[in-house]
Structure formats: structure tokens, C-alpha cells
Amino acid sequence: MFRKGKKRHSSSSSQSSEISTKSKSVDSSLGGLSRSSTVASLDTDSTKSSGQSNNNSDTCAEFRIKYVGAIEKLKLSEGKSLEGPLDLINYIDVAQQDGKLPFVPLEEEFIMGVSKYGIKVSTSDQYDVLHRHALYLIIRMVCYDDGLGSGKSLLALKTTDANNQEYSLWVYQCNSLEQAQAICKVLSTAFDSVLTSEKP
């Protein structure tokens, strides 16, 4: 199931062009950041839908990832300042340098399931759930090269609580930028599916 899900969603050319276009617009504002060519982001605050219908909206795409760490319960003022993808990347970089987040993830691999309901991160046997991120609580997703020269990419999620009082950052490591972008594409499709179904 894992391979099918990954193969099916990674072949979506229309979503790929949307992600890469957004990536280029981010690159132009990066200045001298060495990772500029590998940044892609998904801003879920936007209510713009691509208008594509997804017949498999109930399916769940699964990806093997590793968990780096999280910064939970950020104050409202702190979280609001983390609007753009660069804000998130810089914040995570500083947190890693300050020891609040590790540079290297745990050895254990987890399964990240992405569907129209959100994201579920569970153990590889899928008996234990590590995290659940409801779709409506995900504010932004950013993927970028980890900068360690290993070819791995980081996937960062910015979420809020049900009352919009606190923000949290969740950081996962992907095997490649392609895998990280595939996760962004699936999540983008999930948002489009929900937005399309809500239209009268």
C-alpha cells in the first residue's frame, strides 16, 4: 500500500507545477541562502482552490519519514511572526543551533499518512500513533534541504490548536526533496478536495 500511494501521488504533474512555481517565487526572496534552490512551501491559509476534483479523496497516501522534533505551545505573538516559509526555516535553524531541536532525527522510521482528514504519524507497524494533525489545524507546510550534505530534506509543519491560542512547529526528515514535495502535493490535493466539496 505504501508503494502504491507514493507512486500514485508523485506522478501528479499539475500539482508538481504548482509547487515548483511557488518554490521559484520563494527562491527570489531568499537572498544568499544556500538552500534557495530546494525550498517549496504550501500555505494553507489561502482559500484558493485549483478546482481539481480528486476522486480518491478518501485514500491515504503513506510515506516513510523520521521524526526530528517539535517546538510546542508557542505564544500567539511568536507564532504570528512565523508567516512565510523563510520565517519557519530561520526559526528552525536557530532552534537547532540553540539545542531546542536536534540536527539529526531519531533512528526509528515512522509512517506518515496524508489524507483529506489531515496527517497521522505512526510507528512502522502502525500500532502506535505518534502525532495527529487535523487538516483544519495545519497552517503551513515547508520542505527544504537539511543543509547537512546528506541529500535529506526537512518537512516542517506549523499548526495551531482548536482555539487558535497557540502554535506548534513539527519537524520531520524525508529521504529526499522529491519525497517531501510529494507530501506537499498530496496535502495540497486534500485541501483542494475539501474546499471544492464545501462549494455550494
Curated annotation (Swiss-Prot):
Residue ranges annotated as compositionally biased, kind Low complexity, are 11-29
> Key word Phosphoprotein present in the record?
yes
User: Where in this protein does the record say Phosphoserine is found?
Assistant: 41
> Is Transcription regulation included in the keywords of this UniProt record?
yes
Spans annotated as Disordered: 1-56
- Biased-composition ranges for Basic residues? 1-10
| Residues recorded with modification Phosphothreonine | 38
Q: Show where the PID domain sits.
A: 58-200
Q: What are the UniProt keywords, alphabetically? A: Angiogenesis, Biomineralization, Cell adhesion, Cell membrane, Cell projection, Cytoplasm, Cytoskeleton, Differentiation, Membrane, Mitogen, Notch signaling pathway, Nucleus, Phosphoprotein, Transcription, Transcription regulation
Q: Which domain of life is it from?
A: Eukaryota
Chain residue ranges for the region called Interaction with ITGB1: 139-141
- Fill in the PTM field for this protein: Phosphorylation at Thr-38 seems to enhance integrin alpha5beta1-mediated cell adhesion. The degree of phosphorylation is regulated by integrin-dependent cell-matrix interaction.
Q: Where is the composition biased (Polar residues)?
A: 34-56
Q: Which cysteines does the record link by disulfide bonds? A: none
A molecular-function term among this protein's GO annotations? integrin binding
Q: What does this protein do?
A: Key regulator of the integrin-mediated cell-matrix interaction signaling by binding to the ITGB1 cytoplasmic tail and preventing the activation of integrin alpha-5/beta-1 (heterodimer of ITGA5 and ITGB1) by talin or FERMT1. Plays a role in cell proliferation, differentiation, spreading, adhesion and migration in the context of mineralization and bone development and angiogenesis. Stimulates cellular proliferation in a fibronectin-dependent manner.
Subunit-structure text: Interacts (via N-terminus and PTB domain) with ROCK1. Found in a complex, at least composed of ITGB1BP1, KRIT1 and RAP1A. Interacts (via C-terminal region) with ITGB1 (via C-terminal cytoplasmic tail); the interaction prevents talin TLN1 binding to ITGB1 and KRIT1 and ITGB1 compete for the same binding site. Interacts with KRIT1 (via N-terminal NPXY motif); the interaction induces the opening conformation of KRIT1 and KRIT1 and ITGB1 compete for the same binding site. Isoform 2 does not interact with ITGB1.
Protein name as it appears in the record = Integrin beta-1-binding protein 1
Q: Which organism is it from?
A: Bos taurus
What gene name does this entry carry?
ITGB1BP1
